[in-house]
From Swiss-Prot:
Species, as recorded: Pyropia yezoensis (Susabi-nori)
Alphabetical keyword list: Chloroplast, Electron transport, Membrane, Photosynthesis, Plastid, Thylakoid, Transmembrane, Transmembrane helix, Transport
The name this protein goes by in its record: Cytochrome b6-f complex subunit 7
GO biological process, one term: photosynthesis
GO molecular function, one term: electron transfer activity
Membrane topology: Single-pass membrane protein
Source organism phylogeny: Eukaryota, Rhodophyta, Bangiophyceae, Bangiales, Bangiaceae
Task performed by this protein: Component of the cytochrome b6-f complex, which mediates electron transfer between photosystem II (PSII) and photosystem I (PSI), cyclic electron flow around PSI, and state transitions.
UniProt subcellular location: Plastid, Chloroplast thylakoid membrane
Gene from which this protein is expressed: petM
């Protein structure tokens, strides 16, 4: 169904955003 496709797309994009945020925070911590 279309709903499942949208749901999985939202989940994957959220996971990517979380991964980027964690990587950014780790880089900031290492920079200091």
């Amino acid at each position: 169904m279309v709903g499942e496709i949208v749901e999985s797309a939202v989940l994957s994009s959220v996971l990517v955003l979380v991964g980027l945020a964690i990587g950014f925070l780790l880089l900031k911590v290492q920079g200091e």
